Each structure stands twice: as C-alpha cells, then as structure tokens.
Amino acid sequence: IVCILGTGSNSCFYNGKEIVNNVSPLGFILGDEGSGAVLGKLLVGDILKNQLSPAVKEAFLKQFDLTAPEIIDRVYRQPFPNRFLASLSPFIAQHLEEPGIRRLVLNSFIAFLRRNVMQYDYVQYPAHFIGSVAYCYREILQEAAQETGVSIGKILQSPMEGLIRYHTVPCDQL
C-alpha cells in the first residue's frame, strides 16, 4: 500500500509490478484527507469559527496578515486555493502543542486511513508513505495508524530518497 500525503493525498495498492487498485482522492473539497490542503482548510475553518484558542487565532492573523474576507477571497475567488491552504501547514507544525491543532491533524489522518487505506488489504500489507505532510507529522501519523489498526512501513519525505536507494543499493539488499 503506497500513500502520498503532500499538498494533496492519494493512495494505491501496488503489487510490485503495477498499480492494481486506487481509491480516488477526489481533491481537497470532497476528499484529500490528511493532505496539506485539507489541514489548511480545517485550520482556517477552526480559526474563523473560533474553535481554537484566541492566542492561536491572533498568531495566525498576525503571521499571515489576513482578514476573514481576504481568506474567503483566497479560497473562493483566487486560483489554486489548494496551494494557498497547503501553504498554511508550517503554521500548523509550529503550533502542534495546541490541543485543537494536534487533534485537527490526528483526525484528518484517521479519516485518510479509514476512507482510503482501509479499503485495501491493510491487515496483510503495511502502508508506506511519501510526502512532506506524512514526514513532518510522522509521529501523529503513527498515532492515527495505531488507533485504526493500520501498520505503517516506511515514511519518506521525498521520492528521491527511495530512488537513490533503489539505484545505488544492490538488488539483494533493497
């Protein structure tokens, strides 16, 4: 089971030769659970609906110098709202000590595992992850996996790590 958690999210079952199953990611509006875009969407929603502490809301508005109408404009009227929302991930990473933000990430990863990974044979095969979101929040991803009974294999930040290993390590040592 191979999963990508970056700006968007995706998953598939790869049999060693080809992809034999894929749960459609559906994009950040209908799916993309666990992605940077969805984490950003959840963060903005929680901030604008006063679900996080006043200190976090103030820090967010100060750091990004945005008003609520400007955020709405960026999401609904400007191109590439998914990229804008995903660009908020570093703020999330900086504020993981805030229980509401940590819970936001954990719940999104649990949703990704349930709605995507658990549609494959996750009992027999571990799920391997690649992408900046998977890597940066790997401890929370492990917690979500433990809660859902999904076994995690490798978590890589970039595909280059695996490609370099594949092309430099003898085949019998991969």
What are these regions (language model features)?
Residues 1-55:
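Phosphate-binding/catalytic loop of phosphoryl-transfer enzymes
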Residues 1, 42-174:
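ATP-binding/phosphotransfer module of carbohydrate and carboxylate kinases, centering on a glycine-rich
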